[in-house]
Amino acid sequence: RMSRGLGDVYKRQGNDDPIVSRVGQIMPHGEFYTFESKYEDEESKTCIPALVDEKIQEEIRGYALKVFKAIDGHGLSRVDFFLDKKTNKVYLNEINTMPGFTRISMYPQLMADYGIAYSDLIDKLIDLAFDR
């Protein structure tokens, strides 16, 4: 199956060969990323790519792929990490197999950065569901 207008990028991608986006970073307005800072105050910022060293970004991308494969992931997921700023050590926080999907959510923003429009992303995820 091939969704309209997705080109070669998806001919090679699928549940067994997932796309691993660049690393994104949430910079909350306050100390924590609360409901208010996410949806109301518009002061929090999303950085794509994350404002961390390229080596750390590659480490995070590698971990994200391993986590997705370890749970036999299909379709989409967002893998969240913490970074200890003092030691540059990366810690797994969670894998979210149904991440937020609004236009301001991190997952669609990361896919847009990868070159996949929101409507094309929806088409592709439907195709991946049928491939299961």
Predicted stretch roles:
Residues 35, 48, 101:
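Short clusters of hydrophobic/aromatic residues that line enzyme substrate/ligand-binding pockets
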Residues 39-85:
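A long amphipathic alpha-helix within ATP-dependent nucleotide-binding catalytic cores
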Residues 107-119:
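Short, flexible active-site recognition loops that position polar ligands and cofactors
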